[in-house]
Each structure stands twice: as structure tokens, then as C-alpha cells.
Regions:
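S-adenosyl-L-methionine
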Residues: 1-32, 37-38
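Class I S-adenosyl-L-methionine-dependent methyltransferase module
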Residues: 45-131
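Aromatic pocket-lining residues of Rossmann-like dinucleotide-binding sites
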Residues: 42
Length: 131
């Protein structure tokens, strides 16, 4: 199963082996969510997904809240902004706009992840996304 994000350290390729070591129970706790590869490849009744990256958590919250709207907006952005200059404009708005909604920040985060270098997620000392 693939995930919506490209992510360094993604566990998709090792899931068949990793699943052998996961405990049985009603809930899987995933403290380092990343691409959520473990969650996507298992069928626990519930999950606790956590990560230190607030942009990543915001993305998952917005997708969970309104998946169809998220997909629709991302689809338009991916089609219309598939150029280098658009990437840098979106990154600029993602980093500096004070008027961007959490919903659009999540859409932009997905765009930056999918269009950036190998799905890397890196922030500079000022806390700005810089891939």
C-alpha cells in the first residue's frame, strides 16, 4: 500500500517483516507518523498517530475532516502549478503568508512534499520549509 506522502524513512518496503513484530490489540500507537505507512498497512480498530511536525499533523487532520475537498483542491493545484516558478511561489506563501488557512497550508504541504526533492521535509533555523 502506498501513502499520500513521499517520506524519508518510509516503512512501506519493510512492512511485511515489520507486521510480524507488531503487537495485537485494539489500538496501534504510531509516535513517529511520517507518511503513516504502518497505519496504512495494518487494520487495527483504532490508531493514535503522533509526530513532532505540526505541518504533517495539520495535513492528516484536514484530510480526515474533509477528504473530498482536500483531494479536489490538491488536484487543481497539482495540475495548474506543475512548474518550478509555481513551486517557489507556493513555498513562499506556505512559509510567510499570515492569511493562509490551515486547510490551504495542508494542501500546500502536500504539494511541496510531492514536488520537492525526494519527499524530503526540512526547515531552516527560522522554521521555514526550505526544500
Amino acid at each position: 500500500m502506498s501513502t499520500i506522502l513521499k517520506w524519508a524513512g518510509n516503512k512501506t518496503a519493510i512492512m511485511s517483516e515489520l507486521k510480524k513484530h507488531l503487537p495485537a490489540g485494539p489500538r496501534l500507537v504510531e509516535p513517529f507518523a511520517g507518511s503513516c505507512a504502518v497505519m496504512m498497512a495494518t487494520d487495527y480498530p483504532s490508531y493514535l498517530v503522533a509526530d513532532i511536525n505540526p505541518d504533517l499533523i495539520n495535513l492528516y487532520k484536514k484530510v480526515a475532516a474533509d477528504c473530498e475537498s482536500f483531494i479536489s483542491r490538491a488536484r487543481v493545484l497539482f495540475k495548474e502549478a506543475n512548474r518550478e516558478v509555481a513551486y517557489y511561489n507556493i513555498r513562499q506563501e506556505f512559509n510567510y503568508s499570515t492569511e493562509i488557512t490551515d486547510f490551504m497550508k495542508a494542501v500546500y504541504f502536500l504539494y511541496l512534499n510531492r514536488h520537492g526533492y525526494r519527499g524530503l521535509c526540512r526547515y531552516n533555523k527560522s522554521g521555514h520549509f526550505n526544500i
